[in-house]
């Protein structure tokens, strides 16, 4: 019998003006404790953590094991080859903008890689992940670790056909081919050691599809230039020591998605308008985490005070929240054998 553990960090994407570009991993981990027998038998899945009452334990329906089966079928393996026990421990909030679905997809690909001894590198595994989760900013951060920028390359017409089925269709399809190679490219960006992330997590879910639906289909040049100018500076500003909080605060502003999503998150506009490095010493910048509703604040100190100021504003708008103070997970996703 083999025993191993897969750990996949949470992530925050759309950092500041970096919509669909910038992401960071966070030291809050989805963990899979796996036992693989040398004999054939069923795969048994158990789960504890956020959303337990809503998470399917059916291997054919759970996102982690569905993704594993997708990878196995791409490699001509129809099902889990050995009796497998998987216990998932997941503190990452579901549907809150902390990359829970991306972490699940990564965990599923890594699980298949270990069980079938496919020998895939992290970048090779990312090709499968990106077939399921097609926004690289959060999954690249979770897989590779740290603060990253990323993009999907342009595909040939043949590759577009392979990429065209939806993730749901891929997960249900029995006849599958290998994904296009080198789908995503990333670069690790500098990160000042004194910076930490305060994640304020509202007690309500916001589906990414709903958050996407409020965005415009096209943007004016002024708003695009506004974001591009700040994005260029942010990728350097977060790595400077000492941190310039007023610079970071300004270059974390956004006009591409936050103004449109603010109506879905009561209190967000007030937080963005009233909290700054002058009112909250130690605060460097604030933005939505992913599509929300979680709000991310970067700070060098006074973490609890900043968090409580944000919680107070949310409370005035009738929104209950909790918060975490987290560092980037620089190792990304890992596997450990026992």
Swiss-Prot record:
GO cellular component terms given for this protein: cytoplasm
- Source organism of the structure: Schizosaccharomyces pombe (strain 972 / ATCC 24843)
Gene behind this protein = thr1
- SUPFAM superfamilies recorded: GHMP Kinase, C-terminal domain (SSF55060), Ribosomal protein S5 domain 2-like (SSF54211)
For this entry, the protein name equals: Homoserine kinase
Task: Identify the keywords attached in UniProt to this record, alphabetized.
Answer: Amino-acid biosynthesis, ATP-binding, Kinase, Nucleotide-binding, Threonine biosynthesis, Transferase
The answer to whether keyword Secreted applies is: no
Q: Name one GO biological process term.
A: methionine metabolic process
As its record notes, the protein acts as a catalyst of: L-homoserine + ATP = O-phospho-L-homoserine + ADP + H(+)
Answer yes or no on keyword Amino-acid biosynthesis: yes
Q: Name one GO molecular function term.
A: homoserine kinase activity
Family to which the UniProt record says this protein belongs: Belongs to the GHMP kinase family. Homoserine kinase subfamily.
Q: What is its EC number?
A: 2.7.1.39
Q: Which Pfam families match?
A: GHMP_kinases_C, GHMP_kinases_N
Pathway the protein contributes to: Amino-acid biosynthesis; L-threonine biosynthesis; L-threonine from L-aspartate: step 4/5
Question: Enzyme group, top EC level?
Answer: transferase
Query: What job does this protein perform?
Result: Commits homoserine to the threonine biosynthesis pathway by catalyzing its O-phosphorylation.
């Amino acid at each position: 019998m083999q025993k191993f553990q897969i750990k996949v960090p949470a992530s925050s994407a759309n950092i500041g003006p970096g919509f669909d570009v910038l992401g960071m991993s966070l030291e809050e981990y989805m963990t899979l404790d796996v036992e693989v027998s040398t004999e054939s038998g069923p795969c048994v899945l158990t789960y504890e953590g956020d959303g337990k009452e809503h998470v399917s334990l059916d291997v054919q329906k759970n996102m982690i094991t569905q993704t594993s089966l997708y990878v196995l079928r791409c490699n001509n393996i129809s099902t889990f080859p050995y009796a497998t026990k998987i216990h998932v421990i997941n503190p990452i909030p579901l549907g809150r903008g902390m990359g829970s679905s991306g972490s699940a997809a990564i965990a599923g690909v890594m699980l298949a890689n270990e069980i079938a001894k496919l020998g895939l590198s992290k970048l090779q595994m990312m090709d499968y992940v990106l077939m399921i989760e097609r926004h690289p900013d959060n999954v690249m951060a979770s897989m590779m670790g740290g603060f990253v920028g990323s993009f999907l390359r342009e595909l040939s017409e043949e590759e577009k056909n392979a990429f065209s089925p939806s993730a749901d269709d891929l997960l249900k399809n029995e006849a599958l081919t290998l994904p296009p190679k080198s789908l995503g490219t990333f670069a690790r960006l500098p990160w000042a050691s004194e910076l930490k992330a305060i994640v304020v997590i509202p007690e309500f879910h916001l589906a990414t599809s709903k958050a996407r639906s409020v965005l415009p289909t096209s943007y004016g040049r002024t708003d695009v230039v506004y974001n591009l100018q700040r994005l260029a500076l942010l990728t350097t500003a977060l790595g400077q020591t000492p941190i310039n909080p007023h610079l970071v605060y300004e270059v974390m502003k956004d006009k591409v998605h936050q103004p449109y999503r603010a109506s879905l998150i009561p209190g967000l506009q007030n937080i963005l308008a009233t909290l700054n490095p002058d009112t909250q010493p130690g605060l460097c910048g604030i933005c939505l985490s992913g599509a929300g509703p979680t709000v991310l604040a970067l700070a060098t100190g006074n973490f609890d005070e900043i968090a409580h100021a944000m919680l107070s504003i949310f409370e005035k708008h009738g929104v209950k929240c909790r918060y975490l103070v987290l560092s980037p997970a620089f190792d990304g996703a890992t596997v450990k054998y026992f």
